[in-house]
From Swiss-Prot:
GO molecular function: electron transfer activity; heme binding; iron ion binding
Gene it is expressed from: petA
Protein name: Cytochrome f
Broad class of the protein's primary localization: plastid
InterPro entries: Cyt-f_TM, Cyt_f, Cyt_f_lg_dom, Cyt_f_lg_dom_sf, Rudment_hybrid_motif
Cofactor: heme
Residues spanning the membrane: 285-305
């Protein structure tokens, strides 16, 4: 009996320990969606510069097309869709951080007018939730709820993303007005070429740091190369190329300073887009509807009056 109790308590302790470990992992492990915009969020107070350039372009050097679709106009305190499209060839593979090839991921930053923000979960219609899927959006910062970020997420599944947006109500939010507003989009597919500290990733071209002759190319065990260049003044320069890019030079070759040593492995890129949306006054819409109804009724009465007049004329002619 005592052995059974000991066995029971051992099993209980083991199960509790495993549960605690799993719970700690879930809490401590950061979401992949939260990891992507951290560079821009930490380095820049505002993701859009005064020139209109979105700061993501500092790391993603190649330009690629993006598209955004929003309604022409919305009413106050209304949930609507902003559809972001990031097209690319689904068959291509990108260089991963370990030098291997893998699928592309995508990410986006959506800059809304002040007052517009991410729609609360309880305001999003079920059909819109189906379009959104498992995407997790977050504001750029606590004081910039009108700027939303997402990514990285699998490009094959989310090359088209639906952002649920809540429009402001000028009756409640005094900063909002019934006007036409711009919306700005920045979106990327694939990894960047430069890290925020200015260092290169392994997803870009590597150039020779000096002119001379390539005397030795050493392939490292974990991938990448050490390229020894003998300069004309007798010095030896060693350029390090990480795993990922492919060499396009060979031993004995005479090269110039800044000459590419590798191909450009980047297959992704960053793009910007914009759209306009009108925050429509409901009273104006009602007035417009009343006007259209009035015009329609007036036309109907004119037609009826014309037919009545024609009947009178016809009766007089017969008389």
């Amino acid at each position: 009996m005592q052995n059974r109790n000991i066995s029971y308590w051992i099993k209980k302790c083991v199960i509790q320990s495993i549960s605690i470990v799993i719970l700690m992992k879930i809490i401590a492990w950061p979401s992949i969606s939260e990891a992507y915009p951290i560079f821009a969020q930490q380095a820049y107070e505002d993701p859009r510069e005064a020139t209109g350039r979105i700061v993501c372009a500092n790391c993603h050097l190649a330009k690629k097309p993006v598209d955004i679709e929003v309604p022409q106009s919305v009413l106050p305190d209304t949930v609507f869709e902003a559809v972001v499209k990031i097209p690319y060839d689904m068959q291509i593979k990108q260089v991963l951080a370990n030098g291997k090839k893998g699928a592309l991921n995508v990410g986006a930053v959506l800059i809304l007018p002040k007052g517009f923000e991410l729609a609360p979960a309880d305001r999003i219609p079920p059909e819109m939730k189906e379009k959104i899927g498992n995407l997790y959006f977050q504001p750029y910062s606590s004081d910039k709820k009108n700027i939303l970020v997402i990514g990285p997420v699998p490009g094959k599944k989310y090359s088209e993303m639906v952002f649920p947006i809540l429009s402001p109500d000028p009756a409640v939010n005094k900063e909002a007005n019934f006007l036409k507003y711009p919306i700005y989009l920045g979106a990327n597919r694939g990894r960047g070429q430069i890290y925020p500290d200015g260092s290169k990733s392994n997803n870009t071209v590597y150039n020779a740091s000096a002119a001379g002759t390539v005397s030795k190319i050493f392939r490292k065990e974990k991938g990448g190369y050490e390229i020894t260049i003998d300069t004309q003044d007798g010095r030896q320069i060693v350029d390090i190329v990480p795993a990922g890019p492919e060499l396009i030079i060979s031993e004995g070759e005479l090269i110039k300073a800044d000459q590419p040593l590798t191909n450009n492995p980047n297959v992704g890129g960053f793009g910007q887009g914009d759209a306009e949306i009108v925050l429509q006054d409901p009273l104006r819409v009602q007035s417009l509807l009343v006007f259209f109804v009035s015009v329609t009724l007036a036309q109907i009465f004119l037609v009826l009056k014309k037919k009545q007049f024609e009947k009178v004329q016809l009766a007089e002619m017969n008389f």
